[in-house]
Regions:
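Core dinuclear metal-dependent hydrolase active-site scaffold
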Residues: 1-63, 117-127, 131-162
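Cap/insert and terminal regions of metallo-dependent hydrolase folds
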Residues: 49-127
Length: 162
């Protein structure tokens, strides 16, 4: 767990704001976990860009293979460039929100949940197979691994290697 740092004044202010009926977005945790020898994943909850910029020096995000974009991938939750460079994700998952509200992270490989539907990451040592529920969704940045078929109620779209 990278965030919250409960002694951080910005966190305390966001907690007070939520307690007073304001938005709870900026009390979201930043959680990172990884499979030994396999993929690492980072979730950033519903953090908003302006808040992330305030706490940018309080934490150092680690490199992660999969980043679930904060605030469902909305422009208002775009990850600061310095953090994004440190995380250096293989894939950024842009969540479900109106497409006009989303940031698509130009220059990074993304899977857009609005189009892909449900997403399954099957993580194993050295590789991660990716499946989605939309049978017509595809990306050009994953490698097809022979012998991997559809499963988990989803369609196989490719593999990345860690």
């Amino acid at each position: 767990m990278l965030w919250p740092i409960v002694t951080n004044q910005h966190y305390k202010d966001a907690l007070k704001q939520a307690e007073d009926g304001g938005s709870p977005n900026n009390i979201s945790p930043i959680i990172r976990y990884g499979l030994s020898g396999g993929a690492s994943v980072m979730w950033m909850g519903d953090l908003e860009t302006d808040f992330m910029e305030k706490i940018e020096d309080a934490i150092t995000p680690e490199a992660s293979d999969i980043l679930f974009a904060p605030h469902h991938g909305r422009k208002s939750g775009r990850v600061p460039k310095d953090w994004l460079d440190k995380i250096d994700p293989t894939i950024i998952v842009v969540g479900e929100a109106p497409s006009s509200d989303l940031t698509y992270y130009d220059g990074w490989d993304t899977i857009t949940q609005n189009s892909a539907g449900d997403i399954v990451f099957e993580c194993s040592s050295g590789k991660t197979h990716v499946f989605v529920s939309n049978s017509t969704y595809s990306v050009d940045f994953l490698t097809k691994d022979d012998g991997v078929g559809d499963r988990h109620g989803c369609y196989y779209i490719g593999t990345f290697y860690t």
